[in-house]
Amino acid sequence: VKTLAVNLALALLIAVSALTVTPTAHADMLVGNYTANTDRDRGHNWLWAVRPCTTRQPGCVTVQSVPQPNGQAAWWQADAHLANGRYTMAVDVPDGVRCVVQFFPSHDVYSWDAVSLSGELVTTYDTGCGGGPGGTDTYPFTLMRW
């Protein structure tokens, strides 16, 4: 009886140890509000409201980006997907190219590290300010949860 009790206790200890040291397959971003810090548009700060995707798929978060101050900047929403430790999302922004009196659309791709919350924004556009040619610009950015 004593041997059986010792064996059961040992088996339970091994099972609990295995559960506590098993790494998770993915690191979902914490739900909450973040400030997106970038030099892309110095006239606005961007607040990100991050929540799970409606599909509840692991490694998927929905980002709703709200400009502060709110005047003359459009909010947007997109899903970000986790792969190889990085989140990536693409969004078409109606006023991504912000000139003095005109705004033009852009296609933006955000990619950031799931742990450090730092990454880059690559923005592609067909028309530049002052009727200039289209192009692609890259900006570093960081996220800070608050």
Predicted features along the sequence, with ranges:
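Central antiparallel beta-sheet cores of small beta-barrel/beta-sandwich binding domains
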Residues: 28-30, 36-105, 131-146
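Internal, hydrophobic beta-strand segments that form the core of beta-sheet-rich folds
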Residues: 105-127, 137
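Secretory targeting and sorting signals
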Residues: 1-27
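A short linear-motif detector with a strong N-terminal bias
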Residues: 16, 26-30, 117-123
